[in-house]
Amino acid sequence: CLATTDPNGNPTTGVTRTLSTKNSFNYNTESNDMKRNNTGGKDGWDPSKYLNIWVCDIASSGNTSVLGYAYLPGLQSWNAWKDGLVVDFQHFGTIGNASSSSDGRTPTHEIGHYLGLYHTFCESSGGGCCDNDNTWGSNVYDTPATDDVYYGSVNANTNNNTCNDLFYGFNSDLLDMDENYMAYSNHTWMFTYDQINEMNATLNGYRSSLKNSNVPVNCTGLVSNINIDNNVKVFPNPAKNSISIETSFSNYSINLKNILGKNILSHRNISYN
């Protein structure tokens, strides 16, 4: 969704374009300069009503490559003008000069942070295994513990298992969830239920003013809520060898896909009066 009215009440597409005095912004020394007019950037709009996203050329030192970054909710209450996302132009979407290495999903990852999510992999200074996105106070219990970062692609042959999840409250030892949007791997495509619940909790808490904003928006691609949770049951979850699916819908179509998105099983039920 993009705003259709700016803070002054004027019509807008939700996108502004700024001719900057800088060719790029150094992540180490200028990480917030793109957020101010007087430092070569663009002043953000009221962060209690808008989610500001600055798309620019992010420069970094050494071998570090920074695709984007965002502040967790509550961390910028004293400097609200900093709140929002910064995304390198090469990793925003998939059109034009955008890179395919992140599938254009860098904003998805950063919005996860903006809405209270941590990485799925362990970030403790001592290394080793940890259930990171639950360690730091969030209520995400359904992502397996993961030791360090996996930067590779995710496909049918990806079977990383860096931690024994039996030690972290799981009933079985699961593969690392490298396909999660909050991982650093390529070709990610999912949030878990607990991650979704955590983001909703943030929208009802720290970022409730954004959720309740009266700014008009133009939204496309939305899917109406048909209350899937109460009408479809998939168990066991997580599963290894087999799953069962139950539904109360009389008309339905089920497509089961593998990790590459290839359809491997289809079933349809249609009732006629």
Predicted regions and their residues:
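Active-site-proximal segments of metallohydrolase catalytic domains
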Residues: 1-86
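Acidic glycine-/aspartate-rich tracts in secreted/extracellular proteins
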Residues: 4-7, 58-61, 91-93, 118-127, ...
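Terminal peptide-recognition signature
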Residues: 53, 112, 199
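The catalytic-center signature of Zn2+-dependent metalloproteases
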Residues: 96-189
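A recurrent domain-boundary module in secreted/ectodomain proteins
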Residues: 192-224
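C-terminal outer-membrane/trafficking sorting elements
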Residues: 227-273
